[in-house]
């Protein structure tokens, strides 16, 4: 789904910035370029964006910017993939209850949960349902679906 690099703006290094763009933007683009002729008509491609591309934060500039690029990619590829009959969308997950998030201190988790209208992290199964919907729904194309439980609306 991508990589992240946490550094202040002043400490950001070009090599890490480029690594983020390679992993989060360049790799999906050129992988899709190699596969597009093998994808059956009517199929859908779903990229993984992020809530951090929608709601800016101060933890990782490169992550937010590259995931914003993924959202733009899903929208812009619509025209390029139309001749192949392939749809393209993206999911922008919020905070998903993964092993990585479970290692966060309880106070940090409570702070995040306090900003989510539903008051909890998304389960992996819940976010998987969003991906499944985008794959199965033959009319969804060029969408970025934010699955964040109402982050910042509480």
Predicted features, each with a name:
Residues 82, 87, 141-142:
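Short, small/polar-rich loop/turn modules that mediate ligand/substrate recognition or access, typified
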Residues 38, 120-147, 152:
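C-terminal substrate-recognition "lid" of short-chain dehydrogenase/reductases
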Residues 8-9, 16-21, 101, 108, ...:
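Substrate-binding pocket helix/loop in short-chain dehydrogenase/reductase
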Residues 1-5, 149-150:
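Conserved NAD(P)H cofactor-binding loop of Rossmann-fold oxidoreductase domains
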Residues 50:
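Residue(s) in the substrate-gating loop at a strand-loop-helix junction
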Residues 37, 79-83:
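Alpha-helical segment proximal to the catalytic Tyr-Lys
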Residues 32, 66, 74:
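Active-site helix of classical SDR
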């Amino acid at each position: 789904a991508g990589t992240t690099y946490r550094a202040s703006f002043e400490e950001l290094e070009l090599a890490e910035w480029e690594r983020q763009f390679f992993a989060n933007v360049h790799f999906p683009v050129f992988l899709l370029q190699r596969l597009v002729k093998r994808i059956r008509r009517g199929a859908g491609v779903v990229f993984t964006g992020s809530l951090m591309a929608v709601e800016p934060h101060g933890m990782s500039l490169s992550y937010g910017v590259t995931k914003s690029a993924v959202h733009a990619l899903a929208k812009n590829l619509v025209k390029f993939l139309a001749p192949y009959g392939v749809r393209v969308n993206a999911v922008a997950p919020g905070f998903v209850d993964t092993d990585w998030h479970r290692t966060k201190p309880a106070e940090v988790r409570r702070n995040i949960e306090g900003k989510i209208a539903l008051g909890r992290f998304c389960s992996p199964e819940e976010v998987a349902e969003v991906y499944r919907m985008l794959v199965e729904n033959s009319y969804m194309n060029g969408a970025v679906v934010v699955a964040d439980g109402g982050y910042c609306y509480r």
